[in-house]
């Protein structure tokens, strides 16, 4: 079957989502062609097939004149259907970069410069993990003294001058992020967008020599270009035909992926900048039964930090409990929290634990620590008395708390009393007036213990919950950036394959190229060409025409 369509263009597929529509695709006339053919594979030589196959295909013919084409010296006719025409500069939201001098864009888009910027940012981030962040000046005076500098030169003055004590909001770190973002935008504007613009332009080749110069080239002695177009369309190609010429492509999304990678990296940097300059952070230790206001705890850490309505919310600690391993070590802590508005109405209640925070109005409340607030005891039926527990410093990271119940004249020079020590909320060690061990009691048992004729009952152990509050407007942006980065990185591995064909009498010259999987491309082409039948007898009739 040989159909001459010149100067009209035959398009076998729907408009590609990345292709720019042209005028010749706007108005179409549907023509149904029923073609009954005896088919034979070109590889079969002169042997005829033992069976006949009927092919019925519906194709769309353009009813308007094709766009103006441009012929180059190497036998290539370029069309504007997929990006050649149209107004604008084709650069989208990066058009503002046109006001920059070309020399500045050339410097910013330099690949070694961008790599240097990324390594510098990575080094600063590593330095931020080594240097303690957010400590008091006295801490750095003692840790990095001038009389004994680290590495022979690094003192607290470096930290103070460069702002390394708050690395991720320091001007040097934010400046490097801005410089890297400028390099990414310049590279996208000067390199990636022009490449995509060229890739969107389909082009025809009108000479055998031009097609045979491609990475893959082959000639089918007796084959139809229309059959090749249908086979390519079935394999996912977008197919365009003009007269005896054919152009097909697939995988155009792979050409857009580098731009998507750059945009994703920009999102990550924007999110990180928002986190560093627009967040609030604070921590508080609250005994069970007390409350606090979020705004009293949260402190701004950047010049873009803006408080929200949630800062007026009151947090009430209903109860604090702890879970323990069989060995007695603390395994988990839980805080039953209620959030109340300005009118005292409860708007949210949740029991939080480590790795299970509470979120409200952009504020996240984390369970991070615990403390021992007080012991509630009775003495000879009097009380209860709330005895404040004080932390006792010991070696290592173990916690120990103690309190003292005075006995006798509290105004005497040498006041005696009962000492109580605890390392958690489940057991209390009691010592008598002479400092001798008297026994161990669990607060939940309510069992009395007699010391020097006095009956002591430990009614309750009141713990304090350690909470960390923060607002971070950059988190959703960073998550979106990482998601886009993973997606566009996968898309970038899609091969952008292009195929050209030219009908030269009964012979069909086919060539193609791809930007990835070059070793696999010849096998794919041979697989497709093996499906192209050899036309032995043709009988084409137009059965209907609908305008």
From Swiss-Prot:
It holds the Pfam family ResB. One of its GO terms (cellular component) is chloroplast thylakoid membrane. Its main location: plastid. Belongs to the Ccs1/CcsB family. May interact with ccsA. The keyword Thylakoid applies. Keywords: Chloroplast, Cytochrome c-type biogenesis, Membrane, Plastid, Thylakoid, Transit peptide, Transmembrane, Transmembrane helix. This is Cytochrome c biogenesis protein CCS1, chloroplastic. The chain crosses the membrane at residues 111-131, 170-190, 256-276. It is found in: Plastid, Chloroplast thylakoid membrane. InterPro entries: Cyt_c_bgen_Ccs1/CcsB/ResB, ResB-like_domain. GO terms for biological process: cytochrome complex assembly. The keyword Plastid applies. Required during biogenesis of c-type cytochromes (cytochrome c6 and cytochrome f) at the step of heme attachment. It comes from Arabidopsis thaliana (Mouse-ear cress). Residues 41-84 are annotated as: Disordered. It is a multi-pass membrane protein. The gene is CCS1. Residues 41-63 have a biased composition (Polar residues). The lineage of its organism: Eukaryota, Viridiplantae, Streptophyta, Embryophyta, Tracheophyta.
């Amino acid at each position: 079957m040989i159909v001459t369509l010149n100067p009209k263009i035959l398009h076998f597929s729907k408009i590609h989502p990345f292709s720019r529509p042209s005028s010749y695709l706007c108005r179409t006339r549907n023509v149904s062609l029923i073609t009954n053919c005896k088919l034979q594979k070109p590889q079969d030589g002169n042997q005829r097939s033992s069976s006949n196959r009927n092919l019925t295909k519906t194709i769309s013919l353009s009813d308007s004149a094709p766009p103006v084409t441009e012929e180059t010296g190497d036998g290539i006719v370029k069309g504007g259907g997929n990006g050649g025409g149209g107004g604008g500069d084709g650069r989208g939201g990066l058009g503002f970069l046109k006001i920059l001098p070309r020399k500045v864009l050339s410097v910013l888009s330099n690949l070694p410069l961008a790599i240097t910027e990324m390594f510098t940012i990575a080094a600063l981030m590593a330095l931020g993990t080594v240097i303690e962040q957010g400590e008091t000046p006295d801490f750095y005076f003692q840790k990095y003294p001038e009389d004994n500098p680290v590495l022979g030169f690094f003192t607290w003055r470096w930290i103070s001058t460069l702002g390394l004590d708050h690395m991720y909001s320091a001007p040097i770190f934010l400046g490097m992020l801005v410089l890297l973002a400028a390099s990414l935008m310049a590279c996208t504007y000067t390199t990636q967008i022009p490449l995509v613009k060229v890739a969107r332009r389909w082009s025809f080749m009108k000479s055998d020599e031009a097609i045979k110069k491609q990475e893959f080239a082959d000639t089918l002695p007796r084959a139809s270009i229309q059959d090749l177009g249908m086979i390519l369309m079935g394999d996912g190609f977008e197919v365009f035909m003009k007269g005896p010429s054919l152009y097909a492509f697939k995988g155009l999304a792979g050409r857009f992926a580098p731009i998507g990678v750059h945009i994703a990296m920009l999102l990550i940097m924007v999110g990180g900048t928002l986190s560093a300059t627009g967040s609030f952070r604070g921590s508080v230790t609250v005994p069970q039964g007390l409350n606090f206001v979020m705004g009293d705890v949260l402190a701004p850490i950047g010049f873009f930090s803006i408080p929200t309505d949630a800062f007026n919310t009151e947090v009430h600690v209903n109860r604090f409990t702890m879970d323990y391993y069989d060995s007695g070590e603390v395994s988990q802590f839980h805080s039953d929290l209620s959030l109340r508005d300005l009118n005292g109405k409860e708007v949210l209640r949740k029991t939080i634990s480590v790795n299970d925070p509470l979120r409200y109005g952009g504020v996240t409340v984390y369970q991070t620590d615990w403390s021992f607030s007080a012991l509630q005891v009775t003495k000879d039926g009097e009380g209860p008395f709330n005895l404040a527990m004080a932390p006792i410093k010991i070696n290592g990271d173990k916690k120990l708390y103690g309190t003292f119940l005075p006995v006798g004249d509290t105004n005497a020079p040498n006041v005696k009393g009962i000492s109580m020590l605890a390392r958690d909320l489940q057991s209390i060690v009691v010592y008598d007036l002479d400092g001798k061990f008297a026994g161990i009691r669990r607060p939940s048992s309510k069992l009395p213990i007699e010391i020097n004729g006095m009956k002591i009952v430990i009614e309750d152990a009141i713990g304090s919950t350690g909470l960390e509050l923060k607002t971070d407007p950059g988190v959703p942006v960073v998550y979106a950036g990482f998601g886009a980065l993973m997606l566009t990185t996968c898309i970038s591995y899609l091969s952008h394959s292009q195929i050209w064909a030219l009908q030269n009498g009964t012979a069909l010259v086919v060539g193609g190229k791809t930007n990835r999987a070059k070793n696999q491309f010849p096998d794919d082409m041979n697989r497709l060409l093996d499906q192209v039948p050899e036309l032995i007898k043709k009988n084409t009739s137009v059965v209907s025409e609908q305008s």
